[in-house]
């Protein structure tokens, strides 16, 4: 079991590392490529577009050919794309590399969740996904620090050499440590129950959890996207104050994420999901009524706590009905989360909604819709029946 957890954690970490590692070198990258920082900020959107593109195909391929081949290819693509970025001499080549980085990270991301669905029952999976969320929260804090230390002695290209090395490590883990977990053939009496046709992506329960997780990701990405404006322009924080504040909010996320597995031993998953949405609603009301920086910071802290306590549980429930189509389900969740959050941020920008109102709107909207879905669509018996699925154990 340890090998599956190690490989899943490593596969997921490529995604946030690809976002955060290079940001500290953005001014130098822009200068060397004769591009403005504003032009290169599109690299974030290009990276997400690459992830979404990979997710369209990676899940289905993983269900048909296995998790291991997709993990190896994804890590290889991430490694080569990182080298392409390091060799870029102009903006378009750099953006091409960023797109391919997203493709590699997206494939690995999908496989990681499929592996956890294959190897863990719902109770353990919810705990592991909460821990995974906490570990992921470390990356946005550590990656810029590591990038800064690297750039004290080396050029910006070294940031992408580092990411390339990460791709190599993940590829080696996938090649030599990871074992295939794609479900083995089922007994004839189980085929009708667990066939791809029965594991529909349009069943009410999956759609409800897809909506909840997509709205939750929209909340946290809106917070990340709006935080520079809120903290430095509206609240008057310096760059140093901003970095400290974001580190503290990431610390809150880690503490809550690492505490959630223990909470699952005391409370039902539904209770934690309701607590999560209650925290979102409280954060939205707090921010709308805040007149001091202290109250605003309290509201922002509630956002991080709310996301950390409920997201892993909701993701675990979303994957629960799927045994033979875990890859496709994971892909669908990833695409919805990336595209849904990007659409909200884009629409808010087009409509001229302020950063604070953008955040308040998604907080209140997410909490109300999610609470209604939690009460109206509960896990049914068939979800539990899909949990115990034998998997292949081939190296």
Swiss-Prot record:
The chain crosses the membrane at residues 4-24, 42-62, 69-89, 93-113, 131-151, 158-178, 217-237, 247-267, 271-291, 295-315, 333-353, 358-378. Disulfide bonds: none annotated. GO terms for cellular component: plasma membrane. One of its GO terms (molecular function) is transmembrane transporter activity. InterPro entries: MFS, MFS_dom, MFS_trans_sf, Multidrug-R_MdtL. It is a multi-pass membrane protein. Keywords: Cell inner membrane, Cell membrane, Membrane, Transmembrane, Transmembrane helix, Transport. It is found in: Cell inner membrane. The keyword Transport applies. Pfam families: MFS_1. It comes from the Bacteria. HAMAP family: MFS_MdtL. NCBIfam families: PRK10473.1. Belongs to the major facilitator superfamily. DHA1 family. MdtL (TC 2.A.1.2.22) subfamily. This is Multidrug resistance protein MdtL. It comes from Salmonella agona (strain SL483).
């Amino acid at each position: 079991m340890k090998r599956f957890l190690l490989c899943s954690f490593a596969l997921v970490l490529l995604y946030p590392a690809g976002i955060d590692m290079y940001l500290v070198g953005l001014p130098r990258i822009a200068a060397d490529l004769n591009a403005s920082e504003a032009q290169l900020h599109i690299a974030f959107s290009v990276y997400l577009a690459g992830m979404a593109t990979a997710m369209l195909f990676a899940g289905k391929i993983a269900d048909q050919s296995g998790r291991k081949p997709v993990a190896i290819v994804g890590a290889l693509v991430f490694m080569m794309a990182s080298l392409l970025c390091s060799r870029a001499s102009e903006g378009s080549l750099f953006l091409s590399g960023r797109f391919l980085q997203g493709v590699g990270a997206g494939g690995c991301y999908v496989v990681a969740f499929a592996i956890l669905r294959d190897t863990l029952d719902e109770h353990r999976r919810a705990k592991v996904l909460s821990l995974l969320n906490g570990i992921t929260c470390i990356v946005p804090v550590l990656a810029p620090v590591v990038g800064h230390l690297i750039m004290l002695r080396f050029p910006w290209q070294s940031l992408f050499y580092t990411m390339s090395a990460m791709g190599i490590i993940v590829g080696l883990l996938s090649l030599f440590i990871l074992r295939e977990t794609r479900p083995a053939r089922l007994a004839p009496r189980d085929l009708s129950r667990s066939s791809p046709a029965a594991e529909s992506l349009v069943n009410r329960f999956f759609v409800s959890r897809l909506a909840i997780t997509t709205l939750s990701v929209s909340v946290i990405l809106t917070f990340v996207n709006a935080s520079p404006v809120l903290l430095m322009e509206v609240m008057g924080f310096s760059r140093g104050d901003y970095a400290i504040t974001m580190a503290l909010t990431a610390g809150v996320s880690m503490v809550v994420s690492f505490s959630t597995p223990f909470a699952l031993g005391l409370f039902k998953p539904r209770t934690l999901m309701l607590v999560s949405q209650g925290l979102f609603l409280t954060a939205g009301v707090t921010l709308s009524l805040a007149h001091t920086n202290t109250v605003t910071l309290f509201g922002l802290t509630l956002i991080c706590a709310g996301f950390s306590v409920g997201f892993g549980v909701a993701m675990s429930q979303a994957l629960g009905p799927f045994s033979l189509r875990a890859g496709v389900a994971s892909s669908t969740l990833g695409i919805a989360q990336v595209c849904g959050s990007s659409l909200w941020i884009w629409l808010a920008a087009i409509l001229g909604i302020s950063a604070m109102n953008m955040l308040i709107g998604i907080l209140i909207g997410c909490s109300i819709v999610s609470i209604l879905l939690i009460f109206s669509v509960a896990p049914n018996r068939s979800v539990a029946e899909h949990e115990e699925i034998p998997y292949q154990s081939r190296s």
